């Protein structure tokens, strides 16, 4: 029997298991269901027994997302598995057709291949033994609204668990930051090329405010929404930028121009994010 040792704490109570885990639940120890707390992500083998039930929870301010670990068609599990939107077995079943379909990103109509709960709890009932072996991935995710008001668009543009909302109402950098906070999000802090490309491929040819600023100390750039210094992290300044002109203390981004230091009071679109 193979044991997976990464960051999992396993306790057995009667015939059920209670597991806090970030990766793989070992097949031989799972008994037939139990309680599972998802700290980040977990992959479980579908049991070979019938009527096994996992009660799954995560942090109260997050939700859960279920997908197949191999990326296969999620609908193939329905013959063997029912995922309930809550711990009660009478809670509604989660189906692809009753999910929010965003206008952009991985959860837009036609490509959605995972299901999301509406709270931090779910019950997974393996009602029949599967005819083939497959693994179910369960991740902790943030809630992602359809939009954050008029002239806005939201979606899971980077991965299954985070959320980005573009607002096309022009505001100052400080006002865009306040708008994001009012919607339980933060103004964009770009941590990688992958993240920046996702933003620009989703909303091209648009200038966006970020939370980057050197307003506290000239030349010391900080992602205000996270408190993390820009350097030595990822940066993508445009030609001759930052040019350190007086009053240009906030980072404005564009898909073809790169990053610019710009006057924080200028009215620009913005991107909010939640992770």
Sequence positions of predicted segments:
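Carbohydrate-recognition loop of C-type lectin domains
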Residues: 245, 250-271
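Surface-exposed ligand-recognition segments of extracellular binding domains, strongest
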Residues: 208-247
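Well-ordered beta-strand positions enriched in small/hydrophobic/aromatic, beta-favoring residues
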Residues: 81, 163-165, 210, 250-251
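Domain-level representation of secreted and single-pass membrane ectodomains enriched
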Residues: 3-8, 12-150, 178-183, 201, ...
């Amino acid at each position: 029997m193979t044991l997976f040792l990464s960051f999992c704490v396993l306790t057995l109570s009667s015939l059920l298991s209670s597991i806090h885990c970030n990766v793989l639940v070992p097949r031989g120890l799972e008994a037939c269901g139990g309680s599972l707390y998802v700290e980040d992500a977990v992959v479980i083998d579908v049991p070979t027994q019938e009527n096994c039930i996992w009660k799954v929870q995560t942090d109260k301010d997050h939700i859960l997302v279920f997908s197949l670990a191999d990326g296969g068609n999620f609908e193939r599990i329905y013959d063997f598995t029912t995922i309930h939107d809550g711990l009660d077995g009478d809670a509604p079943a989660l189906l692809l057709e009753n999910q929010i379909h965003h206008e952009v990103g991985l959860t837009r109509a036609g490509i959605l291949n995972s299901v999301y709960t509406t709270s931090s709890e779910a019950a997974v009932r393996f009602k029949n033994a599967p005819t083939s072996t497959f693994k179910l991935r369960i991740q902790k995710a943030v809630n992602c609204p359809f939009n954050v008001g008029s002239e806005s668009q939201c979606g899971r543009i980077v991965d299954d668990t985070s959320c980005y909302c573009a607002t096309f109402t022009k505001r100052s950098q400080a006002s865009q930051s306040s708008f994001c906070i009012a919607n339980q999000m933060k103004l964009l802090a770009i941590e990688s090329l992958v993240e920046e490309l996702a933003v620009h491929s989703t909303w091209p040819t648009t200038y966006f405010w970020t939370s980057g600023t050197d307003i506290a100390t000239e030349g010391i750039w900080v992602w205000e929404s996270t408190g993390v210094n820009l350097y030595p992290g990822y940066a993508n300044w445009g030609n001759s930028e930052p040019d350190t002109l007086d009053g240009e203390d906030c980072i404005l981004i564009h898909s073809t121009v790169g990053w610019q230091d710009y006057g924080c009071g200028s009215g620009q679109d913005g991107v909010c994010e939640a992770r």
